[in-house]
Curated annotation (Swiss-Prot):
PANTHER family: LEXA REPRESSOR, LEXA REPRESSOR-RELATED. This is LexA repressor 2. It comes from Xanthomonas oryzae pv. oryzae (strain KACC10331 / KXO85). Homodimer. Residues 27-47 bind DNA.
């Protein structure tokens, strides 16, 4: 798989940061360095680099980018406390709208360590909910939802979806000729995905944490 000029430049940046600082850049730092409008563009290029075998990414680990063939951990990872097999170390990547879609705010390097039994299937990251459109599913403003990264979802599942540069959590409904994202609060209207919109499933909802308020 041939890399684009941008992907080659991102790969060079990753190598430079690991060599200089002992840790790779975050997705936010990559997006900022290349002038991307959102972190989703950085994620797209990282996915392409991983598919090409140039890097690998460690699930559930902040700054989890590794160069292909990198035998050891980064210096930061080497001194961090190990995580047991029965717990998850999940990055909190930003916020997601349970209301009208909001601009994607992805890229925090904060993380939470918790027991695996909280979620099914196992999540890859957490997102903070903003809004109350999913309240009838028990998802409230300020909750941290677990997201299992996948591009595949069935009608009737709760998904984290991207519409253009905006992220939202809704109930997915797939019809013969249209896709709708349904709220679980009668105060909100369904979102119909238009043919000219850039739409993608980012992951499946798989449980939540409710911080003390």
């Amino acid at each position: 798989m041939d890399l684009t000029d941008t992907q080659q430049a991102i790969l060079a940046l990753i190598a430079e940061r690991i060599d200089a600082d002992g840790v790779p850049p975050s997705q936010t730092e990559i997006a900022r360095a290349f002038g991307f409008k959102g972190v989703r563009a950085a994620q797209y290029h990282l996915e392409a680099l991983e598919q090409a075998g140039a890097i690998r990414r460690v699930p559930g680990q902040a700054r989890g980018i590794r160069l292909a063939g990198q035998g050891g951990q980064t210096r930061a990872a080497a001194v961090s406390e190990p995580v047991r097999d029965d717990v998850l170390r999940l990055p909190v990547l930003g916020r997601v709208a349970a209301g009208l879609p909001i601009g994607a705010d992805i890229g925090s390097d904060d993380f939470v360590v918790l027991d695996r039994v909280f979620f099914s299937p196992s999540p890859d990251y957490l997102l903070k909910v903003q809004g109350d459109s999913m309240r009838d599913e028990g998802i409230f403003n300020g909750d941290l939802i677990g997201v299992h990264r996948t591009r595949d979802a069935r009608s009737g599942q709760i998904v984290v979806a991207r519409i253009d540069e905006e992220i939202t959590v809704k109930l997915l409904k797939i019809g013969k000729d249209r896709i709708r994202l349904l709220p679980r609060n009668p105060d909100y209207a369904p979102i119909e995905v238009l043919p000219d919109q850039d739409f993608a499933i980012e992951g499946l909802y798989c449980g939540l944490l409710r911080p003390n308020r």
